[in-house]
């Protein structure tokens, strides 16, 4: 299963494996700080395929992070969103999941220790 892991840059998820389904075959993320870094570290340390979409500022300007989030949602079969209650990018991604019919789960969190 292709699982997108997205979230606020102020958060980390040191126990990411607790949230992932057992049949995860690929982790999709955005290559940013915080949650995305934890997704990358988990995928690499567990031999799971990692697909990262980076914002293309040259092509999309200020909308680049949102366009990147659209690609992430389109690739995913499930989206795990870790939200700090403030991040507009995470809220945008949740709304895109709804619009595109992609299953998602939202985890509301406070700042956490860094990922391994």
Task: Name what the model sees in each region.
Residues 1-115:
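Acidic/glycine-enriched connector segments
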């Amino acid at each position: 299963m292709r699982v997108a892991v997205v979230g606020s840059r102020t958060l980390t998820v040191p126990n990411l494996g607790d949230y992932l389904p057992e049949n995860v075959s690929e982790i999709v993320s955005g290559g940013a700080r915080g949650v995305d870094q934890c997704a990358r570290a988990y995928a690499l340390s567990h031999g799971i395929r990692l697909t990262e979409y980076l914002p293309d500022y040259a092509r999309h300007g200020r909308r680049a992070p949102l366009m990147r989030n659209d690609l992430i949602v389109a690739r995913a079969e499930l989206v795990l969103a870790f939200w700090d209650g403030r991040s507009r990018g995470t809220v945008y991604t949740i709304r895109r999941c709804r619009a595109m019919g992609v299953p998602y789960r939202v985890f509301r969190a406070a700042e956490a220790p860094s990922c391994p």
